[in-house]
Amino acid sequence: MQRVARIDHPEVHEIVPSHHCVLRFRQRRPVRERGADVVAEALIAALEDADVSRWPPAWAVGDRNTELWAVSGELAFPLERSARHGRYVAVTCLSR
């Protein structure tokens, strides 16, 4: 079962982390407890706490063409639109 972050934003209602995003999140924000469920819960919490903007944080600026970003503290998630209205995919996890 895939976890989905639900947020209150005019364009983005749900964020689904890609497999690559989950792997990068595990590398960039180690979770002290064991188990995939603990990591998934921490990632969903970070996405639900994120501010969605068209502008990346200054430290994440690069040549990536991304329409929207979800930024949660020291983490940034570039978002790609999915086929479902209001649902976006977090393609990776970047950290400062």
Where are the language model's segments positioned?
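Ribonuclease/tRNase effector modules and their secretory precursors
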Residues: M1-R96
